[in-house]
Amino acid sequence: MAHDEQLWLTPRLQKAAALCNQTPAASDTPLWLGVDLGTCDVVSMVVDGNAQPVAVCLDWADVVRDGIVWDFFGAVTLVRRHLDTLEQQLGCRFTHAATSFPPGTDPRISINVLESAGLEVSHVLDEPTAVADLLALDNAGVVDIGGGTTGIAIVKQGKVTYSADEATGGHHISLTLAGNRRIPLEEAEQYKRSNAQEIWPVVKPVYEKMAEIVARHIEGQGIADLWLAGGSCMQPGVEALFRQRFPELQVHLPQHSLFMTPLAIANSGRAKAEGLYAS
């Protein structure tokens, strides 16, 4: 049975947002760590036995491009820094962590980073599958719009029956904005985060293209619900655009969707590797 969006998912995402780079929450249960290596950010999240976020570290970073870790040393350094911070804050030691990868790419890419940071990988799965598992979906589609890629998964009877990855995401939105404003790409990334309402007319065509890509992948799949995840979905206007494009579907865009994939990854470790938790 799918988790209730308002009663189960939304409070956890709100808690993750509130904990981001802040003092951890208290918990008296075992803890599990998940690491999300994104194109625009690296997020490490700790959850407890109730699937509640306990601690969140986030760094905006350009270490992954198109599903490839192009700055391996930078990625390892960030994960190691997150690990040191979390262990110091929580007073425990993490030996294992879960992670993910974009559909169609080599999972060893993410695994190698975590192992080089001193962690054993307890569980690895593709990003939209992680979200589908977190939400316990059935007869639904998951669209994870990240920084560099858009992952798509179809879930039937609790199992992922189809997944794909397209090379379009927040990075392409920044490129469009940089060209329109005639500013450097790094400046466009910052401008995008602080002027979301203002930039919608400029970036809307990019999201329209994403919606058409999604339409191609879900055509004929017979799904009833479409779930949106990923930091790039937090742009105002995205939910309305997808609702307009897919009027026959129930479109869901939870608050703080940036943290949905990290929450899903951490909980995949909790669900699949119950004996491997912080000591």
Swiss-Prot record:
It comes from the Bacteria. May protect ethanolamine ammonia-lyase (EAL, eutB-eutC) from inhibition, may function in assembling the bacterial microcompartment and/or in refolding EAL, suggesting it may have chaperone activity. Overexpression of eutJ and eutS in E.coli leads to multiple BMC-like structures; eutS expression alone leads to 1 BMC-like structure per cell. Pathway: Amine and polyamine degradation; ethanolamine degradation. This is Ethanolamine utilization protein EutJ. Pfam families: FtsA. The keyword Nucleotide-binding does not apply. Disulfide bonds: none annotated. The gene is eutJ. GO terms for biological process: ethanolamine catabolic process. It comes from Salmonella typhimurium (strain LT2 / SGSC1412 / ATCC 700720).
